[in-house]
Amino acid sequence: EEVYPPDEDTFLLLEAAIREARPEDHVLEVGCGSGLVSQELAGRVKSITALDINPHATRAARERGVEVVRSDLFRGIRGRFDLIVFNPPYLPTEPEERGDQWINYALDGGASGRETIGRFLLDLADHLRPGGRALLLISSLTGPEEVERMARDAELVAELVASKGCFFERLMVLRITRSDQAL
């Protein structure tokens, strides 16, 4: 299968997103995979747009009735959002472990597990509306303290809002806001 199927991380992010979402929110889901999170948020928010680099994922999300754009992170998106949710590729992956299938875009976080997360954090503030926030799923394997440092370096503030132990890792959802706004 070429699309990341909903799993423990998907459901943890979905639960946090449902708690965080407001009826007036314009929402962006980055890396939507199957489109489940966007589909579940659709009736709870003003608008939702999903994106994914994987053409198989965009097709799967579209089949769920989700408005989806094929894009590498924010490249295909203009505008600002009240809420941005992202379940990034966060698994540390050595070069010799990398595959060339589309599913690898959902899994391969680079050597540290933070390559895609770093790119996301660098551009995040430009896509948040005033008072906007993001929910970012990470793993204990990703180095949570390092992710929080990366957020600070991008003038963002990260706060843990959900976590769950799973097999060999702890999954966490960080709520991220611009450092120039109160939490």
Place the predicted regions along the sequence by residue.
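Conserved Class I SAM-dependent methyltransferase catalytic core
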Residues: 114-173
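Short beta-strand element of the conserved SAM-dependent methyltransferase core
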Residues: 107, 173-178
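Class I SAM-dependent methyltransferase Rossmann-like catalytic core
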Residues: 1-6
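Mobile active-site "lid"/loop adjacent to the S-adenosyl-L-methionine
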Residues: 88-116
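Glycine-rich, phosphate-binding/catalytic loops in enzymes
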Residues: 44, 100-104, 152-154
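Conserved SAM-binding loop
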Residues: 50, 109, 136
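Flexible, glycine-/basic-rich loop-and-beta segments that form/coincide
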Residues: 180-183
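Conserved SAM/SAH cofactor-binding pocket of Class I
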Residues: 8, 12-99
